[in-house]
């Protein structure tokens, strides 16, 4: 299936999508594409907020975009790889059966699949600014991300795949 089709299917049933991705076999190139795609989309989601901040504070937009690009696209993937390793160790300590690939797949897919809500969060931050709407959309993104991540971990480590 196309990635966009899998993303929409994740909102209907995240465990089914993870099971299908796991059935494709381990491929690190696919994981890296998921991760980098999610990071690029996260960077794009930050653009409206950064443009608003630059306009309101009189800062240079290119400087803000450069810092966000460095942090999100180049440094954040390293942190996400470390988070995947830590979650793998925790799940294994809880009795889950699997390897590090499954943990990376689930985390990176949850991050990518939750990006539509993250893009909405960026629009709210850029057009409305701080306030209850931004908090609500940010909270929604966190809930969606954790729903996909935990459901995926359950499927990957305790499912029948």
Language model regions located:
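Interfacial loop-to-helix junctions that mark the boundaries of transmembrane helices
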Residues: 23-27, 59, 133
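Alpha-helical transmembrane segments of multi-pass membrane proteins
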Residues: 37-50
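Juxtamembrane loop-helix boundary motifs flanking transmembrane segments in multi-pass membrane proteins
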Residues: 2-14, 58-66, 95
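Membrane-helix boundary elements
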Residues: 48-73
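Hydrophobic alpha-helical transmembrane segments and adjacent short intramembrane/lumenal linkers
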Residues: 64-75, 80-161
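N-terminal juxtamembrane cytosolic/stromal segments of multi-pass membrane proteins
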Residues: 1-40
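Juxtamembrane interface elements at the cytosolic ends of transmembrane helices
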Residues: 6, 11-19, 48, 149-161
């Amino acid at each position: 299936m196309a990635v966009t089709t899998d993303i929409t299917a994740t909102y209907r049933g995240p465990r089914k999508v993870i099971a299908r991705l796991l059935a494709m076999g381990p491929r690190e190139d696919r994981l890296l594409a998921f991760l980098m795609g999610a990071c690029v989309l996260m960077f794009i989601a930050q653009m409206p907020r950064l443009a608003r901040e630059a306009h309101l504070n009189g800062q240079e937009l290119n400087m803000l975009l450069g810092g966000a690009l460095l942090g999100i696209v180049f440094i954040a993937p390293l942190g996400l790889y470390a988070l995947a390793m830590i979650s793998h160790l925790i799940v294994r300590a809880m009795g889950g059966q699997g390897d590090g690939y499954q943990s990376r797949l689930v985390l990176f897919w949850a991050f990518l699949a939750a990006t539509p809500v993250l893009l909405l969060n960026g629009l709210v931050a850029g057009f409305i600014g701080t306030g209850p709407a931004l908090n609500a959309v940010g909270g929604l993104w966190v809930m969606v991300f954790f729903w996909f991540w935990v459901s995926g971990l359950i499927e990957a480590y305790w499912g029948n795949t």
